[in-house]
Amino acid sequence: MRTKITLACTECKQRNYDSMKNKKNNPDRLEMNKYCRFCKKHTLHRETK
């Protein structure tokens, strides 16, 4: 079952991206390097509740 998640920038805490993930295959919190338009650079984005 795929659920909707939100990715937040670790530097400025802005919630920039929405994505989907399969909780059965990926039970841990997702972390990705994505572009943050507020910081104007690539930063680590983590899954939020």
From Swiss-Prot:
GO (cellular component) term, any one: ribosome
Family matches, as SUPFAM superfamilies: Zn-binding ribosomal proteins
Database matches in PROSITE patterns: RIBOSOMAL_L33
GO molecular function, one term: structural constituent of ribosome
Keywords: Ribonucleoprotein, Ribosomal protein
GO biological process terms held by the UniProt record: translation
One Pfam family, short name: Ribosomal_L33
Entry's family note: Belongs to the bacterial ribosomal protein bL33 family.
Record-given protein name: Large ribosomal subunit protein bL33
Organism: Clostridium botulinum (strain Alaska E43 / Type E3)
